[in-house]
Amino acid sequence: MHQTSNIRPLKASEPNSPMSRRSFLAATAAVGVTATALGRDQGPSPAPTRYPDPNIVVLDKRFARYKVSNTPIQRLYTGTLWAEGPAWSGVGRFLVWSDIPNNVQLRRLDEDGHVSVFRSPSHYTNGNTFDWQGRQVSCEHGTRRVVRYEHDGKVTVLADNWHGKPLNAPNDIVVHPDGGIWFSDPGYGTLGNYEGNKGELVIKEAVYRIDPNGGKMEIVTDAMYKPNGLCFSPDYKKLYIADTGATHYEKAPKNIQVFDVIDGRRLGKGQEFTHMDLNGKAGLADGLRADVDGNLWVGAGWVGEGYDGVHIFAPDGKRIGQILLPEICSNVCFGGPRRNRLFMTASQSLYAVYVETQGAHIS
C-alpha cells in the first residue's frame, strides 16, 4: 500500500497496478456553446472539423499550451439518458461510465472503441473510480451505498449508513494513496425514481472518508449545501469540491471550494476556489479532475450555448479555457494509455479530446 509520505503525481508511463491487463480483463469478465458547437453534426458520419477545433477556446494564454491544434472534439457514443461517472482502468485499458436512469454501467474498450453494457442492473450507479489495486469502486443511488467490485466478481459494501441512518445517495468518489476512499453524499438519487429510489433524506449532506484499516467512516466536511464532484490536487495536499446546492437551496453559491488536507485524513477550513459565473451567467460545476500541473478540468452546464461543456481553471482559480459541447457536461476523467485524453460524459453522449497534459491521478 502506498504511504502518504511517498505521495507524488503519477508519471505518464507509470503503471496503475501490478496486475497484468490480461488477468485484469479475465477477472472483470466474471462481473459481467457557440453556434458552431450547437450546429456541429455529431451523427454517425459527421463532417470533418477544420483545425484548430473552434470549440476548444483559449481564454487565457496559459491554456494555449494544453490545446492540441490538430485534434477534434469527438463524440464516441450516444444513446444514454444521463451519462455520469467516467473512470479509466489503466490495467484493463477501458473506460467505464454510468447511465443512471437506464440503471446500467457501460464500458468502452480502448483498442477498438467497442461499447457494451458492463453491469445491469447497476443499482443506479453514479460516480465510479478505480483503487490502487485496480478494483472498481462505485456510488450506488438505488441502494444508498458505496461498493467495491472485487476481481473475482464479488461485491463488497464499503458504506451504506452513518450511525445507523441510511446515506442520502452517494454521488462522486476518489481514492487516496493511503487507501482511503472519499465520497460525496448530496442525495440527488433519492429525490425521485428517475435516478434511484425516491425517499427521505435523514442526514445532513456531507463528504466522508472511509479508512482503509477497518473501514471506519468519518465526516470530513458537512459545511457545504450539496457537495458533488471532488478531486485531489496532484500532491494530495488539497481537496476540491463542487457545490451544487443551488438546485435546492436559495442561498447556496455556485462555486468550487478548496480545503487543505491534513495528515491525509482530515480537512482544514474550506474557502472558495472559484465561482461559476461567466459573462453574467452562472451554471453549475459538477465532476472535476486535476491534471499534473494542478489545473482543474470541470464539467459544467445548465446555462446553454457558449457555457455548457468543460471549464478549465488554473491553480489560482482563474478560468483559462473552455471545451464547448452541445450538451451539459456532468463529469470528466483523463484516460488512454498515456492519460492525455479527456473523456467527458455529457447528458446523452460520451465525448473525448486529446490534450497536451496528463491526468494527475490513476482514474
Regions found by a protein language model. Give the residues of each.
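Short loop/turn segments immediately following beta-strands, especially the blade-tip
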Residues: 259-265, 355-360
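N-terminal twin-arginine translocation
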Residues: 18-23, 32-46
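Beta-rich, blade/repeat-based domains predominating
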Residues: 79-93, 121-140, 145, 163-181, ...
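Blade-edge beta-strand/turn elements of extracellular beta-propeller
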Residues: 63-78, 114-121, 152-164, 208-226, ...
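Blade-level signature of beta-propeller repeat domains, shared across WD40, Kelch, NHL, RCC1
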Residues: 333-363
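Blade/loop signatures of beta-propeller domains
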Residues: 43-71, 362
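N-terminal secretory signal peptides
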Residues: 1-19, 30
